Structures are given as structure tokens and as C-alpha cells.
Amino acid sequence: MKVISSIQELRDQLRGQNRVAFVPTMGNLHEGHLSLMRLARQHGDPVVASIFVNRLQFGPNEDFDKYPRTLQADIEKLQKEGVYVLFAPTERDMYPEPQEYRVEPPHDLGDILEGEFRPGFFKGVCTVVMKLFSCVQPRVAVFGKKDYQQLMIVRRMANQFALPVDIIPAETVRAEDGLALSSRNAYLSNEERAEAPELYRTLGQVRQTMLETVLQGQASVEEVTAKALEHLRGRGWQPDYVAVRRRSDLQPPTPENIAAGEPLVVLTAAKLGKTRLIDNLEI
């Protein structure tokens, strides 16, 4: 596996490769990331991964400086997965001058849910993903469903800019107790780690209640999500949202949508101590 930081060297290395499968990451790799590499291999060859902690998507009070950076360990993991190239640019490589041009997602998708609580986050994501796509020129790119809203935004961006890349969704990888794998799980204390799976269990309860009552016309979505928020707060969580949305556009479902069996997803973000976790579950 070649480790490359220069954009020009990367382009030289990939010249003539017309079926590149790309997995962008911020490093501190875990089994969830590695599952993305394996899925990428099913859809293209060679597999290219990137590691870049993108300052543009961190807010002023977020964890950019303390975000775990474990490059050597990440390299060893990627080598075992047969990754062809790791693109690991420095900030100077990616942004040799101030990044004055930004890619901003539409407000109806970028300013809700995560976008409401992390202003500017998706603008930073879209900008760096567009630049990475320009550098790598992939034919396919794999994004995890754990970041459900990000997946939808990137997919819509690729479609509206007519980018020659297929966005492949990857299922969320979970620990045995249900907690979605995340680099930020490392911030949890032992006590918090024991409580953390409750977030997924709460989503499961929302899903079950939706199927048993809301879809039968016996309760409202608002009643179900309010109960979930109350449950999390009662266990010491600080939830930002528990929201049931249409899978197609992440807008709230209408009664007509529910009656017609529109595919839905329940999404949540909540702090446990100082660590903010996100998760989702399709209904």
C-alpha cells in the first residue's frame, strides 16, 4: 500500500485506473471503517482510502484538536485490508491557501437535524468531499448509514453536480450490545460505555411503537418521539433530537405518508456526559 499526501502524486498514481472505489475517513479506524473497505472492494478496484481530519466541519466549540489521530495504527489496518493507496494529506496539502469557495447543501436538507445543532457542519463536509472526489476521481464511493443525513446530502450533491461517482451506502456496524461503532466512543467512561447502548434500544422502541400504534392510526409521531426524549433525559442523557423522518428527503412524514406506508427512519443525537453520539434505525 502506498501512503501519499500530495494531490499531484495521487493523481499520477491513479492515472489509468477507471474503477477506483473510494472510502473517505477521518482516521482512528475501527471495524466499522474496515467494513467500508470490504464493501468498496465488491464495487470497484483498486480501493483508495483517505484520512483527513477536516477542520471545516468542526464548529468553534467542537473537538477538532482532541479528535484521535492514530495514523500508524490506521496504516497497519488498511494494509491488512488490501487497500491500494492511502491518501493522507496534511492541512497544507488540502488547503494550500484559504478555502474561499464552499459547497453549501440546500437548506431543507442541510439545516435540519444535525445541521440545526452543528451550523456549518454539512458545508464543511460537502466542501471536503467535493475536493476529495476531485483528487481521487473515484467511480464509486462508500459512505456509512450511521451518518444517515451525511449520506443523503453527499448522494444528492453527486447527483445534482452530475459527478461520475456512484454513492454506495454501507450498513452500520455495531458492538455486541448494539452500540454503533464510532471513533468518539473512545471518549466514554466505563460507566458511560455501559449506558451507551440505551440509545440504540430507544430507537428500537420507537420503531416498535411506530409499527404497532402510529402506522395503525392509534398514536402520533410527536407522541412517540416525545416519550423517547423523556426516556433518555430520565436516564441522564442530553438529547438534541429524536426525529422520525421520510427516508427519501428527511422531511417529517404527513399522515398521508404514514397511511401510504412511506419508508421512514428514526434518527437521534444525544450527549452522554461530554460525548455526543448519533444513531438511526430504518422503520
Swiss-Prot record:
Enzyme active site: H33
Keyword Nucleotide-binding: yes
Example GO molecular function: ATP binding
GN (gene name): panC
Residues annotated as binding (R)-pantoate: Q57, Q150
Primary location class: cytoplasm
Keyword hit for Cell wall biogenesis/degradation: no
InterPro entries: Cyt_trans-like, Pantoate_ligase, Pantoate_ligase_C, Rossmann-like_a/b/a_fold
EC number(s) per entry: 6.3.2.1
Name listed for the protein in its UniProt record: Pantothenate synthetase
Transmembrane annotation, as ranges: none
Comment field (misc): The reaction proceeds by a bi uni uni bi ping pong mechanism.
Family annotation (PANTHER family): CYTIDYLATE KINASE/PANTOATE-BETA-ALANINE LIGASE (PTHR21299), PANTOATE--BETA-ALANINE LIGASE (PTHR21299:SF1)
